[in-house]
Structures are given as C-alpha cells and as structure tokens.
C-alpha cells in the first residue's frame, strides 16, 4: 500500500519504460474507512523523548484502559515495536518489574529462531488467546508479512511507511472500534535509517502536522514526490554522470558481469549465526489441541540416515551441525550428483531453523567474535550459547541473544 510509483523517476533511458498501476484508483481504497479508519494514530508522545520507565507505565495504563472499555471482551492484545533489539529486551525487563497485568509477554526480535517465532504467532492467532491479556514486544521484523491482529499499538517513530506497516498489525480485520497506535520517541531512528532518503526528507521538509496528515489520509505519495525530486536532482549532477556513460551502457549491452560489479542494491553484509540449541520438533498450532510440525518426514528421515533422531521431542542442534560437517567434508563425486544436491537443499532448510542473521559491522557481532564461538563453513557457530553470567545465559530460546550477558561472561 505504501510503495512509490517509480515510473515518476527521470531515468535516462533511450525508450521510456511504461509502469502500470495495478489499482489505478488505489487512493480510494486506501482512504476507505475500512482501511484508513481501522486505527487512529495518536501523537501524545510524538515530540518529546520518553524514558523506558515512563513508557512502560504509559503502555500499561492504556492497555488497562482498553481492557475496561464497555463492549470489549475484558482483555487486550498490545504490541510495541522498537528500533533496536537492545531496547526491546530492556523494555521486557521493565515490564517484568511492574505490577502484573499481562498474562503473557512475548519477545520477538531478529535473534529469535524461526520455531519460537512460529510458536508466538500461533499463540496470538489461537482464538482461545482472546481470553488472555497479551503483550508482544518486537522490532521491525513484525512489519514483513506477519499476520496477527492486535488491539493497541505503540511504535518508536522511524519511517512514515514503517509506522503504517505496524498499524497493519492492529485491528487487521477492521472488526473492532477504539483501536489506536501511539508513536513515541526513544531511540534515534538515524542509527538504522540515516542514509534513507525517506528519513532525510521527513527531517528536512515534513512538519509534525504534515506527518500526522500523511498517516491519517494515507497520502504516502506526498512523501515520495519529495524523495523523487531529490533523486532526480542527484541524477543530474556531474558525479553521477557515469550512470549514463558507464552503467547504462552495461545494462543496454546486457553485460551482466559488469552490472553486478558496478551496482549494489544492499550495501550492508549480514553474517549468519548458528545456535546449537535443542529445538522442538513440533509446536502448538493456532488450533487448540493441534500441533504444527516444524520438520517434515523427509527432513527427519534425512537426519535419521545419519544417526540423528529427536530425543523427548527435541532435535539437538549440535548433532544437526555434525551432520552438516559430514556432508561438507565427505568425498564428492567428480560428476554432477543430483542426490547430493538434494541432500544439501534439505540440510539448508534444517539449518535455517537454528540460525539468525546479524549485520556484519554490528557491535554485537564483533562482541560475539570475542570468544563465544568460531567462524566455520559459512556460519558463525555459537558454541558458548549456554554460558551464563550475572545477567543470564548468552542465548535463550524465548529471549534470543542476550546482549547484556556479553558484558559479564568470560569466554575461553
């Protein structure tokens, strides 16, 4: 809903490429009350920074207020999104110290493994969960294709269209009234989005009132017109003229090797961390009494062929990794071997359940490399995940990577 009309960019091509709107009257849909009126954005916390303790009190207060409204079922599902995993974990700790209100508090960040992620989403989608007060503490991972329906939302402001994405997880089916999303200032969004033209335009040219209007009227085209103006201006400058004389020539000549060398869409490089933790073979599904399998019969049979079987419903990550090593180090046929290729594909799918990604230059990855594991076979193997210090274990199935534990655990 928030994607720009990139056909408005002035790209110096010999032939103008036509861009077709899949919905020519898209604005009429976006401004329909069933879409635009599902959620009311609130700006009480928008202009002044708030500290973590006051934010926790505010979230609790509004959640209690929603639960007690006439016509509600006496419970509330609240979601709060932070820019950083660190802030999400800190907020979790603050909430635990408050007077108990929520029956369940879930943490969903980029270091939570896929089985736990599915466990959380299934719980939120289970109709019986509507009998509980639930708080979901998350990061931007919740913005991409997570089909949940919450009652109240809170979000650290970042990008306007990102704010709208979070709102898409509140009153998703437009069946409730009184659903709100509160935007607050805690972490500086420039840490993640400082180079993003959308973020720059908001800071330089969009007032608080205009920010509110764009979200209220779903007029994201207004923002992208400013962004396109900036990009078009940059494209006219001498320092990007090599686009016309160099890069464009490679594209027109279908010289894909040169295109690959000269064009990079995503600058940051991620590293994949493997956690050799025991994982459940199945978790509760969104239907009460029914289990969802995390590994297929074929995947479990593949592991069994190497002598690895689940024990008490858990699959040992250390044993899974040893299977991967055996696959890599065994003798490979000189010719193409379909069975071997299929085996590696199955193995990659299994490995993905035990992994998460970190930005290559991030502080937490550099700290992990200070003795918590080793780099091997394309992964960072987190061998010390169970080590525990004053601030808890380095890695926990429900909490993900514990940054605070990195400070007080001595690794050998």
Feature locations, PLM:
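A short beta-strand-to-loop transition that corresponds to the Sensor-1 phosphate-sensing loop
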Residues: 1-3, 82-85, 138-141
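Interdomain hinge/linker at the junction between the two RecA-like core domains of SF2 helicases
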Residues: 2-66
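Catalytic core segments in nucleotide and nucleic-acid processing enzymes
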Residues: 28-31, 99-100, 111-112, 132
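C-terminal helicase lobe and adjacent C-terminal extensions/tails of nucleic-acid helicase motors
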Residues: 49-81, 86, 90-118, 126, ...
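Aromatic/His-enriched, Gly/Pro-containing loop or helix-boundary segments
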Residues: 123
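Conserved two-lobed SF2 helicase motor
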Residues: 127-143
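Conserved ATPase-coupling elements of RecA-like P-loop NTPase cores
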Residues: 146-150
């Amino acid at each position: 809903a928030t994607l720009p009309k990139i056909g408005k960019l002035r790209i110096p091509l010999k032939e103008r490429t036509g861009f077709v709107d899949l919905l020519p009257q898209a604005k009429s849909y976006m401004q329909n009350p069933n879409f635009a009126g599902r959620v009311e954005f609130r700006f009480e916390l928008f202009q002044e920074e708030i500290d973590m303790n006051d934010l926790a009190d505010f979230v609790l207060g509004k959640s209690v207020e929603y639960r007690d409204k006439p016509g509600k079922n006496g419970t509330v599902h609240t979601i709060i999104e932070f820019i950083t995993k660190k802030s999400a974990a800190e907020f979790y700790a603050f909430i635990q110290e408050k007077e108990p209100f929520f029956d369940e508090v879930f943490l969903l960040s980029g270091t939570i493994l896929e089985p736990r992620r599915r466990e959380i989403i299934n719980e939120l989608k289970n109709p019986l969960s509507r009998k509980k007060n639930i708080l979901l503490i998350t990061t931007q991972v919740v913005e991409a294709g997570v089909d949940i329906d919450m009652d109240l939302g809170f979000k650290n402001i970042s990008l306007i269209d990102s704010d709208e994405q979070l709102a898409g997880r509140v009153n998703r089916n437009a069946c409730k009234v009184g659903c709100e999303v509160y935007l607050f200032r805690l972490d500086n969004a420039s840490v993640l989005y400082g180079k993003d033209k959308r973020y720059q335009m908001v800071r330089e040219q969009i007032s608080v009132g205009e920010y509110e209007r764009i979200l209220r009227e779903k007029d994201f085209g207004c923002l992208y017109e400013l962004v396109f103006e900036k990009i078009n201006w940059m494209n006219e400058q001498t320092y990007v003229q090599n686009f016309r004389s160099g890069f464009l020539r490679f594209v027109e000549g279908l010289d894909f090797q040169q295109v690959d060398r000269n064009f990079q869409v995503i600058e940051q490089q991620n590293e994949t961390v493997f956690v050799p933790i025991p994982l459940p073979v199945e978790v509760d599904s969104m239907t009460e009494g029914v289990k969802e399998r995390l590994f297929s019969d074929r995947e479990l049979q593949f592991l069994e062929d190497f002598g690895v079987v689940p024990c008490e419903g858990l699959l040992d990550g250390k044993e899974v990794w040893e299977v991967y090593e055996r696959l890599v180090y065994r003798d490979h046929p000189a010719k193409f071997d379909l069975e071997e290729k299929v085996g590696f594909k199955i193995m990659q799918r299994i490995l993905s359940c035990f992994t998460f990604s970190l930005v290559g230059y991030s502080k937490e990855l550099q700290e992990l490399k200070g003795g918590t594991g080793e780099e091997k076979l394309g992964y960072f193997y987190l061998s010390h995940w169970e080590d525990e210090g004053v601030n808890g274990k380095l890695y926990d199935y429900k909490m993900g990577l514990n940054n605070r534990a990195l400070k007080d655990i001595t690794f050998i």
